[in-house]
Amino acid sequence: VHLSGEEKAAVTGLWGKVKVDEVGGEALGRLLVVYPWTQRFFDSFGDLSSAPAVMGNPKVKAHGKKVLDSFSEGLQHLDNLKGTFAKLSELHCDKLHVDPENFRLLGNVLVCVLARHFGKEFTPQVQAAYQKVVAGVANALAHKYH
């Protein structure tokens, strides 16, 4: 992902304030609620029958944190996202058979959740920088797909 120095500063500056467990659980939960077909990858998570069930599900929250921990790792390697996410791309492609479009959807949901959490601090410039990053991460995660 090519970001200007200003964009990198905006992304990393805001990310330092993100509560990964909270934002990760909310982002994954919203993905599962808004795009219910994504739930098929989470059969082992128990009750996903309603929005409150999904949003309160401890396994959704835990996996959301795990997802954002990986995203944090990616932010430290913006110049090598494909390398950073190679193993995860392989896992999601070969073993889990996740539709790569879901990575794009989750990235967009994450941007919405960040906007909700940070309000006015999430300026159009910050949003534009994050859109570039989530697109780059989604692209890197889809890299191993044939």
From Swiss-Prot:
Task: Give one GO molecular function term.
Answer: oxygen carrier activity
Location of Phosphothreonine modifications: T12
Q: Which SUPFAM superfamilies match?
A: Globin-like (SSF46458)
Q: Which GO terms describe its biological process?
A: hydrogen peroxide catabolic process
InterPro entries xref list: Globin (IPR000971), Globin-like_sf (IPR009050), Globin/Proto (IPR012292), Hemoglobin_b (IPR002337), Hemoglobin_oxygen_transport (IPR050056)
Example of a GO cellular component annotation carried by this entry: hemoglobin complex
Which Gene3D superfamilies does the protein's record reference?
Globins
Q: Which domain of life is it from?
A: Eukaryota
Report the residues modified as S-nitrosocysteine: C93
Tissues/organs with expression? Red blood cells.
Query: Which Pfam families does the annotation name?
Result: Globin
Modified residue N-acetylvaline is at which positions? V1
Phosphoserine-modified residues are where?
S44
Which residues are listed for heme b binding in this entry? H63, H92
Q: What family classification does the UniProt entry report for this protein?
A: Belongs to the globin family.
Quaternary structure and interacting proteins, as annotated: Heterotetramer of two alpha chains and two beta chains.
List the protein's name: Hemoglobin subunit beta
Q: Which organism is it from?
A: Pteropus poliocephalus
